[in-house]
Every structure is written in structure tokens, then in C-alpha cells.
Design a protein with these regions (language model features):
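Acidic, glycine/proline-rich low-complexity segments that act as flexible tails and inter-domain linkers
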Residues: 1-49, 102-117
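Iron-sulfur (Fe-S) cluster-binding segments and ferredoxin-like electron-carrier domains
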Residues: 29-30, 69-81
């Protein structure tokens, strides 16, 4: 039986990301270097808000890895669970029940990190 821990999934996701970076170094350098550096920095919009915006987009795009990554990075930048759920509510307002079902991935992640009950 497969372990359904979202935190174990996150660890595996980062391991596979590192593995693919070594197989595609030029693309990885461009994408994880200059492209991300140009976007994910403080500017007119602060970095935490950009990560929350990215979370809403990840929910809409149905990208599980992106949802986990953006939630993790938003938390590292000081986002509260309230801010994360408010971000989810924006995504849900645009995407309906499909987005709601994807926001459950975020809730599961927060629960496993023991940030919510």
C-alpha cells in the first residue's frame, strides 16, 4: 500500500526535482535562476504576497506540486494559515467546487504540519 502522507510526497517531490535538475542543467539554471529570480523577489508586490498569488494560480492549474511548494514557501515567509485559507477562497471563488477540492490538498498539508486541526 502506498503511503499517502503529503509531507513524504513533498520530500519525494524535491528529490525528483533535484534529479531532473541534474539531467537538464541548462534549463534548470535558466528556470530556477534568472526566471524565478526576476519574479520571486520583493518589488511593488512583496514576496509573501507573490507566493500567495502563486498558490491561488496553482489551485486553478490543478498542480499538486505547485500547491505544496507555494504553501511551504508562503509559510517560510511568514504567511498565516488564515492568509493561506483566504488565498484558497479567492481560488475557489474563481474555480468553484473543482478548486475547492484542490484546496483540500493545501488543508491536508497544513494538517500534517500540525498547523490546523
Amino acid at each position: 500500500m502506498m503511503d499517502d502522507s503529503i509531507l513524504k510526497y513533498e520530500d519525494r517531490m524535491w528529490q525528483l526535482t533535484d534529479a531532473t535538475k541534474t539531467k537538464m542543467p541548462e534549463l534548470a539554471d535558466a528556470y530556477y535562476g534568472s526566471v524565478k529570480d526576476a519574479v520571486y523577489r520583493d518589488g511593488s508586490i512583496d514576496l509573501k504576497t507573490k507566493r500567495l498569488m502563486s498558490l491561488a494560480i496553482a489551485i486553478q492549474a490543478d498542480c499538486k506540486d505547485c500547491m505544496i511548494s507555494q504553501t511551504s514557501k508562503a509559510l517560510e515567509l511568514g504567511a498565516t494559515t488564515e492568509e493561506i485559507f483566504e488565498t484558497c477562497s479567492v481560488a475557489i471563488s474563481m474555480g468553484g467546487t473543482l478548486a475547492w477540492s484542490k484546496a483540500l490538498i493545501v488543508a491536508d498539508y497544513l494538517r500534517e504540519k500540525e498547523l490546523i486541526e
